[in-house]
A protein has these predicted regions:
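Twin-arginine (Tat) signal peptide motif
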Residues: 1-8
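N-terminal export signals
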Residues: 8-28
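C-terminal segment of N-terminal export signals and the immediately downstream linker at the start
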Residues: 23-53
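Conserved, mostly hydrophobic/aromatic
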Residues: 43, 66, 100, 140, ...
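Structural motif corresponding to the early beta-alpha repeats
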Residues: 72-170, 177-182, 208, 218, ...
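Acidic/histidine-rich catalytic cores of soluble enzymes
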Residues: 74-75, 170-271
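C-terminal helical cap(s) of enzyme catalytic domains, especially alpha/beta-barrels
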Residues: 294-309
Length: 309
C-alpha cells in the first residue's frame, strides 16, 4: 500500500508551489499568470439547512438552487438532511444524481454526522461506527463524489484519543480506498478543532485517501453546549490542516458594510489556503443569524470572488 508520505512526494513534482503569504490583501489574483481561477467555489448544503428542515426548500432542489440561483456548479451534501429519505442508498440517491447531472452540477462530497464515534474507546462501538459509514462511502461513489467528511470524535486523554481516532479512521479509509473515496476529517469541536492534534492524527493514519476539510470557523475546543469558551487560533489551525486538505469550507456568519466577514479575515485565510498549493473547490457554508440563507450564500460568494478576482 502506498502511504500518504509516498503519495505526497510524487505529487510534489506537479504542485503549483505558488507562495502568496507575503502578498497584500488586494493581490491574490496577481499570483495567477493564467486565466484559470485560483480556486473554484462550491456550495455546502448546510447553508440551506434551516429551509430544508422547515420544508420550505425541498431537498431535491439543492442542485437546482446552486446552479440556477448562484451559478455554482459543484455541491457538498449533508447526510443529516436526507438520511431519513434515503438511508444512504436506493432510488432517492439515484434521483439526486439524475437531478445534479441534468443541471450540470458536480457532487463533491457528503458530510456525515450521527454515525458514532470513530475514536470510541470501546472497540466494538468503534467498529460499529466505522461500518455505519460504509453506506455513505457507497452513496458518495454512486453520486460521483471524491470524499465523505467524517468526525474524529473520541473520549479520554489527548494521546489516547489520537490513537483511537487514527485506528477508526484507518479502518474506514481502507474501505474508502477500495471504492476510490477519500475519508476527510473536519475540525468540528473538541480535539478535532486543535490543529496540532488533528494533523497528528493524519500523520498516524498516513494514507493518501485520508485527509482533512479545514473549516474557517469551527475552532471551538469544547462541546456543542459550551462552545465559545475556548477557541483555537483559526489561522494557525487552517495552516496546520492544509497539508492534508482535500476540501475547504468557507464558514461565514456576519458581514460588515464592506462585505467582509466579521469573524474571519478572508484575505488572510485564503492566502494560507493558496500558499499550501490548494487549487480545488472552496465551499460556501453560511450559517449566520442576520441574513437569510439565500442572501448569506450570495454575500459569501461575493466575498470569495472579491478575494479571488
Amino acid at each position: 500500500m502506498e502511504t500518504r508520505r509516498e503519495f505526497l512526494k510524487k505529487s510534489a513534482a506537479i504542485a503549483s508551489g505558488v507562495s502568496v503569504m507575503g502578498l497584500g490583501a488586494s493581490s491574490l489574483s496577481s499570483c495567477n499568470s493564467s486565466n484559470i481561477p485560483l480556486f473554484k467555489i462550491s456550495l455546502a448544503e448546510w447553508s440551506l439547512n434551516k429551509g430544508m428542515r422547515s420544508g420550505e426548500i425541498p431537498h431535491l432542489d439543492f442542485a437546482k438552487i446552486a446552479k440556477r440561483n448562484f451559478g455554482i456548479d459543484a455541491i457538498e451534501y449533508v447526510n443529516q438532511l436526507f438520511s431519513d429519505k434515503s438511508g444512504g442508498s436506493g432510488e432517492y440517491i439515484k434521483e439526486m444524481k439524475n437531478i445534479a447531472d441534468a443541471e450540470g452540477v458536480k457532487s463533491l462530497l457528503i458530510m456525515c454526522d450521527g454515525e458514532g464515534y470513530l475514536g470510541d474507546p470501546n472497540n466494538s462501538e468503534r467498529t460499529q461506527a466505522v461500518e455505519n459509514h460504509y453506506r455513505w462511502v457507497e452513496a458518495a461513489k454512486y453520486l460521483g463524489c471524491h470524499s465523505i467528511r467524517v468526525n474524529a470524535q473520541s473520549k479520554g486523554e489527548y494521546d489516547e484519543q489520537m490513537k483511537l481516532a487514527a485506528d477508526g479512521l484507518s479502518r474506514l479509509t481502507e474501505y474508502g480506498a477500495k471504492n476510490n473515496i477519500n475519508i476527510i476529517v473536519e475540525n468540528h469541536g473538541g480535539l478535532s478543532s486543535n490543529g496540532k492534534w488533528l494533523s497528528g492524527v493524519m500523520e498516524m493514519v498516513n494514507h493518501p485517501h485520508c485527509g482533512t476539510l479545514p473549516d474557517f470557523g469551527n475552532f471551538y475546543l469544547g462541546t456543542w453546549d459550551d462552545k465559545g469558551k475556548e477557541w483555537y487560533d483559526r489561522y494557525l489551525g487552517v495552516k496546520e490542516l492544509m497539508p492534508y486538505a482535500k476540501a475547504v469550507s468557507a464558514k461565514s456568519h456576519e458581514f460588515n458594510d464592506d462585505g467582509n466577514e466579521k469573524e474571519t479575515d478572508y484575505y488572510k485565510m485564503m492566502k494560507i489556503v493558496l500558499d499550501a498549493g490548494y487549487r480545488g473547490y472552496v465551499g460556501i457554508e453560511y450559517e449566520g443569524p442576520e441574513l437569510s440563507e439565500m442572501d448569506g450564500i450570495g454575500a459569501t460568494k461575493k466575498l470569495l470572488e472579491m478575494v479571488r478576482d
